[in-house]
């Protein structure tokens, strides 16, 4: 076990350029996960191939010598198919046909099949093959048939460590990975009066429109708040009137419920009234003023009338 651990450590400590496919095949999932955790990765992949790819991408980030990213993609476990041999076929055309099609010097008149400004040896390269025309009217066709493995581009997983975060992307082709590595290696120079100036100019009228809309919204909201205040005051007045009416009704109901108390108070008032009249007459006689008997009889009549009204209300 110790020998295996030491070999794994020695393999992982090698620089990325010195790693071979044999070294990568000797690595295990646990070795890769342990290495990634030691480097600060929180959740390494449980898949062996993905963990190895994460180790290779991490080593490429820590080793600034290889900025192109080709070392990472070269170590992907997906083996690329070998380039198939090119099949070359030689087609011989008769000279008579070439002469009939205008294989003549440029100084002569234009013919039916004459080509202007065409060099004697023309070369055309395309995706399917390569065509060459020589002096001796020979055409060499170089055909490179594509295998089904080539049509499906090699796709792998890409891990990016940036600002303390780990981002893992699946299905990244090699060309895209190279472009990302080039983009990360080159610094970005932003012009002073470039894109940001235009964005500022665009943002200014937007802010003015917002400043114009805000006062209108405030003016629309002000009368609504005033109307709500007026309605609130009216509701308060109505509720106050209801409260006062209920209070009056409670007072009248209390007086009707206790007739004995009212009658006793009336009796006490009637008993006290003759004494008050006598004292009042003595005061008047002492001062020298006298009242007519009509005035003396009016005061008890007034009190009796009040008592009679109270008795009628109680009944």
Swiss-Prot record:
Listed InterPro entries: CCT_CS, TIFY/JAZ, Tify_dom
UniProt note: phenotype after gene disruption: Plants lacking both TIFY4A and TIFY4B have larger leaves and cotyledon laminae, a dome-shaped leaf curvature and shortened siliques.
One CC-aspect GO term: nucleus
Cellular compartments annotated: Nucleus
The entry's keywords: Developmental protein, Nucleus
Residue span of motif Jas: 233-260
Major localization class: nucleus
Additional information: Redundant with TIFY 4B/PPD2.
Known function: Regulates the arrest of dispersed meristematic cells during lamina development.
Name under which the protein is recorded: Protein TIFY 4B
Name of the encoding gene: TIFY4B
């Amino acid at each position: 076990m110790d020998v295996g651990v030491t070999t794994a450590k020695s393999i992982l400590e090698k620089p990325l350029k010195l790693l071979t496919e044999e070294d990568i095949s000797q690595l295990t999932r646990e070795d890769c996960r342990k290495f990634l955790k030691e480097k600060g990765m929180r959740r390494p992949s449980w898949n062996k191939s993905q963990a190895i790819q994460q180790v290779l991408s991490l080593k490429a980030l820590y080793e600034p010598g290889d900025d192109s990213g080709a070392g990472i993609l070269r170590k992907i476990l997906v083996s690329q198919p070998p380039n198939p041999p090119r099949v070359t076929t030689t087609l011989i055309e008769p000279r008579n046909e070439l002469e009939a099609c205008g294989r003549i010097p440029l100084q002569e008149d234009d013919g039916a099949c004459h080509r202007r400004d065409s060099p004697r040896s023309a070369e055309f390269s395309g995706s399917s093959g390569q065509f060459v025309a020589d002096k001796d009217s020979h055409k060499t066709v170089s055909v490179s048939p594509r295998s089904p493995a080539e049509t499906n581009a090699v796709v792998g997983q890409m891990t990016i460590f940036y600002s303390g975060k780990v981002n893992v992307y699946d299905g990244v082709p090699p060309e895209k990975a190279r472009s990302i590595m080039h983009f990360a290696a080159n610094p970005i120079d932003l012009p002073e009066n470039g894109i940001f100036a235009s964005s500022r100019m665009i943002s200014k009228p937007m802010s003015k429109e917002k400043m114009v809309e805000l006062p209108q919204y405030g003016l629309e909201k002000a009368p609504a708040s005033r109307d709500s205040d007026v309605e609130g005051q009216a509701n308060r007045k109505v509720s106050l009137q209801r409260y006062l009416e209920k209070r009056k009704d409670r007072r009248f109901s209390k007086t009707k419920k206790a007739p004995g108390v009212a009658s006793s108070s009336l009796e006490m008032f009637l008993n006290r009234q003759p004494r008050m009249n006598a004292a009042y007459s003595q005061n008047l006689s002492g001062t020298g003023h006298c009242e007519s008997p009509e005035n003396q009889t009016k005061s008890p009549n007034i009190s009796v009338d009040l008592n009679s009204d109270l008795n009628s209300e109680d009944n």
